[in-house]
Amino acid sequence: MKRIAVIPNNSKDIGLVNTKRLVEFLNGKAEIYIDEAYSVLGLNVNYVAESEILDNAEYLIVLGGDGTILQRAAECAKRKIPVLGINLGKIGFMTEIEIDDMEDAISKFLQDDFTVEKRMMMKAEIRKENKIQFSFHALNDVVVSKVAGEKLIYMELSTD
C-alpha cells in the first residue's frame, strides 16, 4: 500500500471539497498523511504535524497550483519523494492533472501506471566575505533583490 502525503492549498480548494474527494477516493487504497490542522474534517487519515508530513510518505499529492508545488519541491527532492500535482490554479505547468481527471489519474497512479519526470534543481548561496551565509535549492526560479539602502549588489552566476 502506497504511503501518500496530501497537501492542499486551501485558498484554491475552498471548503477543501476536492481534498475530501481525493481522500475518500484513496481510502482503503493507500495510507494517507495530512496536516493535523485539518483534523476538524474528521477524515479517515493519519493526521500529523505539518513539519512532519513527509516523514512517512513515499509520494506527495498536491492540490493547488504551481506555487503549492514550488513550496515543497526542495524538501521533496532531498527526500526523493515524487510529487503529483492536481491543478486547481489557472495554468498549471507543473500541476499536470486537471481536477476533472483526478480519479482516473489517481487510479493509474495506484496501479503504478506512471513515470516520474525528473526536474533540474538550482542551488543558490548567499555569501558575505566569501563565506556561505545561507544556501538553498529551488525548482523554478530564484529571485535576487537588493537590501533597502544598498545602492549596488554584486552577483556571481555559475552553471555546471
What positions do the PLM features span?
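Short, acidic/small-residue loops that bind anionic groups at enzyme active sites
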Residues: 80-97
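Catalytic core of DAGKc-family lipid kinases
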Residues: 93-160
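N-terminal glycine-/serine-/threonine-rich phosphate-binding loop
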Residues: 1-63, 68-78
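Anionic group-transfer/hydrolysis microenvironments
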Residues: 37, 89, 143
